[in-house]
Regions:
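Short, highly charged C-terminal tails/helix-capping segments
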Residues: 124-148
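Short, internal acidic amphipathic alpha-helical interface segments
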Residues: 42-85, 89
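Short, charged/polar, Gly/Pro-enriched secondary-structure boundary elements
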Residues: 24-30, 94-97
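A conserved amphipathic terminal alpha-helix motif
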Residues: 105-131
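A short, surface-exposed beta-strand/turn
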Residues: 33-41, 114-115
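Ser/Thr-rich, low-complexity intrinsically disordered terminal regions
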Residues: 3-28, 37-48
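Solvent-exposed interaction surfaces and binding hotspots enriched for charged
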Residues: 5, 55, 125-129
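A short acidic/glycine-rich loop-to-helix N-cap element
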Residues: 94-110
């Protein structure tokens, strides 16, 4: 562990995990996992705190709407020890054996995008908690996207 960051080696995979504070703490800080595989790298950003299991169907429906929209990666729910964590994940095809050849700017751009997506979700997931339908929350998201 270096400065709060865990570097873990699993068989042929390497994983870096760290926490990053979000400006809105509805679901805690962001948990970032970057896992290098033989043929690429997965960037995954989730929340530190799980959502209520009763919200799971609505969150999945909302995320399915989003996944059919503009995102390069995908928003999902991770099941970790029976708790459900909203997350955004993107896979990059890279060679972890040749770190000098990585486009570090691209890795940083995708990581920043993942932070942005999860930060933005803190505006929409509470609407589902308040009883708003996934379709209406998606319409809110679309309206905000078109206003940007």
């Amino acid at each position: 562990q270096v400065d709060g960051t865990d570097f873990t080696r699993y068989d042929d995979d390497y994983e870096v995990m760290f926490f990053y504070p979000l400006s809105k703490h509805t679901y805690g800080d962001a948990v970032v996992r970057i896992t290098a595989y033989e043929d690429g790298c997965t960037i995954n950003v989730s929340y530190e705190l799980p959502i209520d299991e009763a919200m799971m169907p609505d969150v999945l429906t909302f995320f399915n709407y989003l996944n059919n929209s503009r995102y390069v990666g995908k928003v999902m729910l991770l099941d970790i020890d029976g708790d459900w964590y909203p997350a955004y994940e993107v896979f990059m095809s890279i060679n972890p054996e040749d770190i000098d050849a990585w486009d570090r700017g691209c890795v940083m751009d995708y990581t920043f995008n993942a932070f942005y997506v999860m930060q933005e979700m803190t505006d929409y997931l509470p609407e589902l908690e308040k009883g708003e339908t996934p379709k209406n929350v998606y319409a809110m998201w679309l309206s905000d996207v078109w206003d940007e």
